[in-house]
Amino acid sequence: MALSDHSRQLLDTLNKQRQSGFLCDCTILIGDFHFKAHRNVLASFSDYFRAYFKDSLDSIVLLDQIKVTPSGFQTLLDFIYSGNLNYDSCNLEEINLAAQHLRLEDVVATCRTKIESLVGLTKPSVTHLAPTSSSLDENEYFTSLYPREAMKVDAIEISYSQSKVKKGIKGKKSQKIKRWKRPLRSHQHVKKKSSKCQLSSPKTPAVLSLDAKELELMAADHVAKDNTCLLSFTSEIDCEIFLSQNISLETATMTQQKPAKLQQDCAMKEHCISNIADITNVCTMEGCDKELDPKYSKNKPVCNTCGKVFSEASSLRRHMRIHKGVKPYVCHLCAKAFTQCNQLKTHVRTHTGEKPYQCKKCDKGFAQKCQLVFHSRMHHGEEKPYKCDVCNLQFATSSNLKIHARKHSGEKPYVCDRCGQRFAQASTLTYHVRRHTGEKPYVCDTCGKAFAVSSSLITHARKHTGEKPYICGVCRKSFISSGELNKHFRSHTGERPFVCEVCGNSYTDVKNLKKHKLKMHKGSEEAIEMKSAENSSSSEDSTTKSPEPESLELKPSDLFLPLTLHISPDDPQMLLPVSDNRGLSSETLLRASVPSYSEPQFIFLQQMY
C-alpha cells in the first residue's frame, strides 16, 4: 500500500536536512556566498550537476557569478528541495539564465512561458495610452519621456487635450490588463490636477501627444534591452511623462503659484523620481527584499529588529545577517563560517600566520590593527584614553576599564555552575572550571608538561630557553618570573608576609608556609586541636608545645619553583592575621594572603600550591 504523501514527506525531510546542514556532502560557492546541499538531490534534477559529480568527487563546486547569481541559485535550490518555484518580474531573468546554465529544462520552459506572457501584457497596456497627432519630432518626444537622459530642457509650457487622453485610456481593454486600470487612472488623475495650474502662452504653445505605434516600438526596445521588471514599464512611462510635464509647469508658474501648491508639486515630483529609482535599481538588489527600501529614502536605514541606525543600506544588509543567523563567508581550511568578510580574513591569518600590522618601535607583528593599537598603548607609553572615574587609573582598551570597574562595584556576573563561585571576568571562570575538569590545554613542546593557564606555560618555557627578564634593582640578579623576583626581594627587605595561623611563624613564601603546616601541624583539624590545647594548658606543660623552629629553617635547595605572579614593589604588604579560635582553609589562606591579585593570578596560585 503506497502512501499518497510519501514523496512530499521525503522532500520536506531532505529540505530540513539541507537547511540544518545535516548530511550535506557538497558546498556550492558563488562569489562570497556558499550553499550546502546533497549531491544525489542536485544530480537528480540538474544535468549540469549530474555530469559534474560523475567525473569529480570534489565537495566544493564553484559557479560563475555572471551566469548564476546567488539569489537566482537560491531560488532554484528551494525549487529542487520543495517543488515550489518562487519568482517575480524582478528575478525572472536571472532565474532563467541560472536554469539554462545548470540545465534545468522544466524551469527554463516555465520561465520562457512567463516572459512571453509578460511581454504580451506590456504591449497592450502601453498602446492604449493616447492615439493623437504629434507636433513633436522623435528627438523632442524622447526628451520629454526621458528628461534625465537628455540635455537640459528650457522652461516650456505644456498643454494637452484632457479629453483625448481620457478617450484613449477608456478604450477597449482585454481581461488581462484590467489590473492596470487603477494605476493608469491614478496617473491621469495627477495629470488632471497639475493641468489646472498651467499657463497658456500664445507665442510658443507646445502640445504633447502620444503615438501608439511609437510607444509600442519603444516598449519592444525596452523589453529587448532588459527583460527584468517588465511589469513596471507602464508605471515608469507614466511617471516620466508626469515628471517632464511637472518640471515645465513648475518652471513656468514659479512666480504665480502659492507656497502650498508648490509644495504639492514638489512632493509629486519627488514621488515620481523615487518610483523611477525603485524601478530601475531594485531588481539589482538581493531578492528585492523590503530591507533594501531605506536606501531610496532620505532617512537613514534602521534595523526593524533592534533599532540600530546605519549610514548605508549595505551596512543594514550585513547587520541583518546577525539576526537571521546567515554566515555566507566560510573558511576553506576549517569550514568555520562568519557573518562578514573581514572576519573571515582575520580568521584565515590564524592558519597562515600572517601578521601585516607591524610595530615600528619593536618590529612585533599582529594579525589585527586593534592588537597593534593595544600593544602600543601598553608597552610604548602611548596614550591610554580610558580612565577610571573612581581611582583615575588609565587603560588601553574599554574592555579593560570595564573589568577594572567591577573591582569598585563588586560585580561578578560570571558564575560557576558546579560550585556557585562568582567571577568578574569570563576568562577567570574558564580557568576556574579547569580546576573541576582537570583540563590542561597548554602543553610544553619541549618536555610535554601541561598547564591550565597560558601564562604558566610562558613562564615554564623560560626554564628551557634560559631567559630571565626580571632583574633585582638591588643586587642585579635576574629571574624568570616576577613572582620569583618579589620573593627574592623580600630577602633584602626582611618581609615575611605569610603567617601560620596555628603557631604564628611567618615566611617569605607561601610554599614554605604550606610545607610547614604539612610537617608540623598535619592538617587543619589537628592544628585547631593543638591550638586549643595550647591555650588551655598551664605554664608547666609548656614543654608539650611544638618543636622550636630549628627544623623550620629551610635551605635554598628546599624551595620549590617560584610563582609566576606579577607583584610590583608598590603592592601593599600581604599580612595574614592570626586567629586563636579556628584554623583557616587553604583557599581562605590564599585569598587573604593575596588581596591585591586578580582572579587568574589567584587561581594559578591555588593550582601551584
UniProtKB/Swiss-Prot annotation:
GO molecular function: DNA binding; DNA-binding transcription factor activity, RNA polymerase II-specific; zinc ion binding
The keyword Signal is annotated on this UniProt entry: no
Domain of life: Eukaryota
GO terms under biological process: regulation of transcription by RNA polymerase II
Record motif Nuclear localization signal, residues: 172-188, 257-262
Pfam families xref list: BTB, zf-C2H2
Gene Ontology CC entries for this record: nucleus
PANTHER family: MYONEURIN (PTHR24394:SF29), ZINC FINGER PROTEIN (PTHR24394)
Protein name: Myoneurin
